[in-house]
A protein has these predicted regions:
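Hydrophobic core of transmembrane alpha-helices in multi-pass small-molecule transporters
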Residues: 26, 103, 114-129
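Intracellular juxtamembrane helix-capping segments at the cytosolic ends
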Residues: 128-142
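Glycine-rich segments within core transmembrane alpha-helices of 12-TM secondary carriers
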Residues: 72, 147-175, 181-193, 289-293
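Intracellular loop-helix junctions on the cytosolic face of multi-pass helical membrane proteins
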Residues: 1-20, 143-144, 171-281, 299-303
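C-terminal ends and interior cores of transmembrane alpha-helices
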Residues: 95-116
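Central cavity-lining transmembrane alpha-helices of secondary-active solute carriers
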Residues: 62-83, 130, 164, 290-303
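Cytoplasmic membrane-interface "Motif A"-like loop-to-helix N-cap segments
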Residues: 85-97, 144
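Short amphipathic helix-loop junctions that connect adjacent transmembrane helices
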Residues: 37-60, 262-286
């Protein structure tokens, strides 16, 4: 059996593999939020300005942003299924990282076909990367481990740090050198995350490998199990829990609808506001995007090393 240094070695009481995934996810979120902070502003910036954009209307830019975000949330479902059935988590993560790197670099070019190609690659790559790196985090801990929750809290801080740095640095570069330099920087850090994970992934041993054919259940056995589950009615406790899940899911719709305004309408509002000029602050308005990320970092930091 392969040794599993990712689990056997610990740092701050947690498997060392957690911190490998922490940095891989941090650089991926750097690239994602860095690009996301620029997207709508690039779309609405006038073609004839000093830092020319595409000259879209705010409505069209918001529509594209909404479609992009919707697909970014949908594709992880498909990416998770493909990883479970075919690729395994590690190959799915590497595949997603490659696609997203290519997507960011495609955005760094001016022709419109490259722009749409870049968005498509980012959507597909995110579907492979995002759900599967989180799944590996869960497999670093035995079932019922009290450390798993705090492990995910540490992992989530990588998301916050990456988003914080990405929105600031990509925004600064886009404002002072040009939009495509900002998109290119996002690609550079995505490549860093990809290389880091690829070179160190063997430390995870058997975790995240493609499923073996012998371990896959026969189709008839699966169908029989499904039929057996169907015949069993939900208990009272299960029904109550499903109701709670439904209520939370309903209200989460409004939360995410408001949250996603940070990358669209709030960005445009901040860009058009005269407040910045009155203070003589000619800085990348896209860096305003990091405020909610900064707040979330402290909101989730209380249980880091429990």
């Amino acid at each position: 059996m392969e040794s599993n240094d990712a689990i056997n070695k610990e740092v701050f009481g947690h498997p060392v593999g957690l911190f490998v995934l922490f940095f891989a996810e941090m650089w991926e979120r750097f690239s994602y939020y860095g690009m996301r902070a620029l997207l709508v502003l690039y779309l609405v910036e006038e073609i004839g300005s000093e830092n020319p954009g595409l000259g879209w209307s705010a409505e069209d830019a918001g529509s594209l942003y909404g479609s992009y975000t919707m697909l970014v949330y949908i594709t992880p479902i498909l990416g998770g299924i493909i990883a479970d059935k075919v690729l395994g988590y590690r190959k799915a993560i590497t595949t997603g990282a490659i696609l997203m790197s290519l997507g960011h670099f495609a955005l760094a070019f001016n022709p419109m076909p490259a722009f749409y190609l870049g968005l498509g690659l980012l959507i597909i790559g995110n579907g492979f990367f995002k759900p599967n790196i989180s799944s590996i985090v869960g497999q670093l801990y035995p079932d019922g481990s009290p450390k798993k929750d705090s492990g995910y809290t540490i992992f989530y801080q990588g998301i916050n740090v990456g988003a914080f740095l990405g929105s600031i640095l990509c925004g600064y570069l886009a404002e002072n050198m040009g939009w495509h330099y900002g998109f290119g920087l996002a690609g550079v850090f995505m490549v860093i995350g990809m290389i880091q994970f690829y070179l160190i992934q063997n430390m995870f041993g058997n975790i995240g490998l493609p499923p073996k054919k012998g371990n896959l259940p026969e189709t008839n056995d699966v169908l029989d199990s499904i039929e057996e589950v169907k015949k069993q009615p939900l208990t009272k406790v299960e029904s109550q829990r499903l109701i709670v899940v439904g209520v939370l899911a309903f209200f989460s719709i409004f939360f995410w609808a408001a949250f996603e305004q940070a990358g669209s309408s709030l960005n445009i509002f901040a860009s058009d506001s005269k407040f910045w000029d009155s203070l003589s602050l000619k800085q990348a308005i896209s860096t305003f995007f990091f405020v909610n990320i900064f707040f979330r970092f402290f909101l989730n930091s209380s249980s880091l090393f429990e």
